A protein has these predicted regions:
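Sequence-structural signature of mature extracellular/luminal beta-sheet repeat domains
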Residues: 1-321
């Protein structure tokens, strides 16, 4: 079936009727929102090398960490600790190129991983975590590839004993970006977004074994030739909420075929619709609020918020989903 992506809306039961998509706060180039049980939203300001916080109902933001190691994707693990992908988007010395975990109660920061086979990571981008403590993160290079020590863009697993295992790499995938789990934690979803002509713009699904090994690779959705997905979230029914699209073509390698918004897609690849957001470029999305029905969307310079009908699933509040 051919879909006219520019005319797709969401049916009743997904986006709350009359709910505006409103700016929560505006900064620079934003990524990786993560929302605590109390409602505090952590998000990355990559360009200014900071992790910021936003309190709903309060104008503006607070600085949580500066410098942040060019932090990108953020996630609260099953114990409510803040996982951070410290990247290298600018190809300079401020990029941490590592995974860290912060105990928000004590402020203690722990380096979980900074290399593989003795070589520094490219630029950790996004992260997912199981309730058993396993952590999965993507490590692409979207910046200066001459800074790479590794010769591949891959997905890794950090086990509770601290060991690091490469679980996905080229040629099965090209440029891993957003990553998430299904509510039962048995499916791993991966955004493979390679912005070159004929590069992947796919959402992959993998079966995930108890020990954290992915298998059974299959396509959920292909956004080609438009701007594919970046980050994503999952609701309690298993639907994917993918930040994707762009309002105008960047050239033949990334066309304007996919308009910007949060694309709601079932695990079987059925497009339920789109929450339109006019700003380029949407980067990531998460659920928050008392009822997990508040959606926070990071974009080029604005953190947006809107309301949805189906509560989200996040690992640190899995008992509520």
């Amino acid at each position: 079936m051919t879909i006219d992506h520019h005319s797709v809306g969401l049916p009743a039961g997904y986006h709350t009727a009359e709910a505006d998509v409103a700016p929560a706060t505006a900064v620079a180039f934003l990524e990786g929102p993560a929302c605590t049980v109390e409602g505090l939203v952590y998000f990355s300001d990559i360009a200014n090398n900071r992790i910021l916080t936003y309190t709903p109902g309060v104008e503006g933001f607070e600085v949580f960490r500066e410098p942040s190691g060019r932090a990108n994707g953020l996630l609260l693990d099953s114990q409510g600790r803040l996982l951070a992908c410290e990247g290298n988007e600018h190809g300079d010395d401020d990029g941490g190129r590592r995974m860290t975990r912060t105990d928000l109660a004590t402020g203690e920061v722990e380096i979980l991983a900074d290399s593989f086979d003795g070589k520094r990571f490219n630029a950790p981008n996004d992260v997912a975590a199981r309730s058993n403590g396993q952590i999965f993160f993507t490590d692409p290079c979207y910046g200066d590839r001459t800074t790479m020590e590794l010769d591949h863009d891959s997905v890794y697993r950090i086990d509770t004993d601290g060991s690091v295992t490469r679980v996905l790499t080229q040629p099965e995938i090209q440029r891993p970006n957003g990553i998430h789990l299904s509510p039962d934690e048995n499916t791993l979803y991966l955004v493979d977004s390679c912005p070159v002509i004929d590069g992947n713009r796919k959402i992959w699904a993998f079966d995930l074994s108890e020990d954290g090994t992915p298998s059974g690779q299959r396509v959920v959705y292909d956004f080609s030739p438009g701007r594919g997905g970046d980050g994503m979230a999952v609701d309690s029914q298993g639907n994917l909420y993918i930040a994707a699209g762009i309002s105008r073509s960047r050239g033949p390698h990334e066309t304007g075929d996919i308009p910007p918004g949060i694309w709601v897609i079932t695990p079987d690849g059925d497009v339920k619709g789109r929450i339109p957001i006019v700003e380029d470029v949407l980067t990531n999305v998460t659920f928050g609020g008392d009822d997990l029905k508040t959606l926070y969307v990071a974009s080029g310079k604005t953190l947006f918020t809107t309301r949805v009908e189906i509560p989200g699933w996040v690992v640190h509040r899995r008992a509520e989903s």
